[in-house]
Amino acid sequence: MPQLNAVGIVSSDMARSIAFYRLLGLDVPETPGEGHVDVTLPSGVRLMLDTEEVIKSFRPEWERSTGNQLSLALECGSAEEVDETYARAVSAGFHGEKEPWDAFWGQRYAQLADPDGVPVDLYAGL
């Protein structure tokens, strides 16, 4: 049976995307001059970033779509970590969609957008 192993995001600005995901605590390697990077998350799933040029190299008809076809949700170790991670990203100039709040379902929750508009949720149990 197929298993989810990776999530891919097409980046319009690889350096900015790498900076964003590093601010969230991901161990994203440097990739000077390359159009692809991936990082294995603690869960074992890989987050892959590719430039538009890489995608067009094997799919020339590719065009960036509007709207979001996916979102990411990153579990933090505590409610405080949600707040700190959100504040760090917004202070660095990244877009905060929704400031941290105590959700009725029992989690501290916040929403950011990565440099290409991909929603990134941060959460932790209360």
Regions found by a protein language model. Give the residues of each.
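Conserved beta-strand-loop-alpha-helix junction that forms the acyl-donor binding cleft
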Residues: 11-13, 104-105
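Residue-level signal for the nucleotide or nucleotide-sugar donor/cofactor binding architecture
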Residues: 9-12, 77
